[in-house]
């Protein structure tokens, strides 16, 4: 059966979504989960774009062992050099270089003739091959490019040593029939097409990314690129979970396999949603909250008699199911460590100890500790960066009443090691807390977005607060969870400030 490689670009193309801002620890955590999911290639970032991206790609390349790690680069020698420095520690060094090929891009963006574009692409591939055994070349905006020109330039880059040719529908303009036909044409006309892999990369501007990707597979694509939950610029990329499940459920038709561990899909989706702060729409295919819900009485009756009457996908297939009671307040450190490892967390002793302390606090207050609670608690510990002095909330107290002005008092340990007490009022309890904590930093903090969601069910569920701020003209998002939503809100606000400090430290001391 033909094998389709899954190329995940959640950490590169996905992170280009408006409002997404991942730090290195979060990217590493997502990369490790993508490895557990079984993706063939992880595009970890664009190393030449910033010190932060370089650091993330470098560390992911050294961490991930069972998936190929790649970095994006323009067809520029400096970009390729930087990507090699970031990727060279990987098991199989891989680079993804790109150059636009559509008339509108060549004329207005590149300001180059078709011949100059071919020359630049060939030189870049030859240069990259000096470092990398695996070189993927992308024809940016391929679908809107002239077909004959695509054949010309692809002939040259294949001869130069490219091992994969990517054919992106960069602006999501294609229809399934047209996109499939383009693959058929290229595979029939590019010299040496049988010696390289052709890859599909679809955007969802017209809502056809999944259909277009499947059409490419039907017409010979050997690799598909996309993101978890379909995140990405504008309307997003193709959702890889949709492709993986569609190819599995309709294996009778497509006759291909992916190597994806389908039972890891739900956990991967939840992790990406949590760390990117992008909420999954309830009716999202495969991973939405309502994906397996039946409201109609006729449907419910049928499912009760035989689930296959209305369910073509078993919830268990993607790791969906009842969240069991896993630990309680009498559970010991060894059991906690074992459960953390079962859930896929490889925490340092220090982080495990901190997580265990938080677990015991929660267990004393909460009747039942669910797997979802543990995932939230362990994720928060795993993504903490400890190499930069940060603010730490020691205490927060709010005085509130319908006839009183809300007043917040906080005691905070500053990055300099000083304990500082701050007080402020606000129109409500949350604003009072934010106004109080804003006094800790020299410049104004603008809260762009704030929300609290429930983790799990019941009146004793954890509340997860997410705060998106703009400070020094830079947007940063913080998060925290607690049974007390005011405490969670205060810690989320400080988490956003701390993430800004980490960014500034990295900018001042690049890797």
Curated annotation (Swiss-Prot):
This is 2-isopropylmalate synthase. It is an enzyme of class 2 (transferase). Keywords: Amino-acid biosynthesis, Branched-chain amino acid biosynthesis, Cytoplasm, Leucine biosynthesis, Manganese, Metal-binding, Transferase. Its cofactor is Mn(2+). Residues 4-266 form the Pyruvate carboxyltransferase domain. The keyword Nucleotide-binding does not apply. Belongs to the alpha-IPM synthase/homocitrate synthase family. LeuA type 1 subfamily. PANTHER family: 2-ISOPROPYLMALATE SYNTHASE 1, CHLOROPLASTIC-RELATED (PTHR10277:SF9), HOMOCITRATE SYNTHASE-RELATED (PTHR10277). Residues 392-511 are annotated as: Regulatory domain. Mn(2+) binds at residues 13, 201, 203, 237. Homodimer. The keyword Membrane does not apply. Its main location: cytoplasm. Pfam families: HCS_D2 (PF22617), HMGL-like (PF00682), LeuA_dimer (PF08502). It catalyses: 3-methyl-2-oxobutanoate + acetyl-CoA + H2O = (2S)-2-isopropylmalate + CoA + H(+). One of its GO terms (molecular function) is 2-isopropylmalate synthase activity. Gene3D superfamilies: 1.10.238.260, 3.30.160.270, Aldolase class I (3.20.20.70). It is found in: Cytoplasm. GO terms for cellular component: cytoplasm. InterPro entries: 2-IPM_HCS-like, 2-isopropylmalate_synth_dimer, AIPM/Hcit_synth_CS, Aldolase_TIM, LeuA/HCS_post-cat, LeuA_allosteric_dom_sf, LeuA_bact_synth, PYR_CT. One of its GO terms (biological process) is L-leucine biosynthetic process. Its EC number is 2.3.3.13.
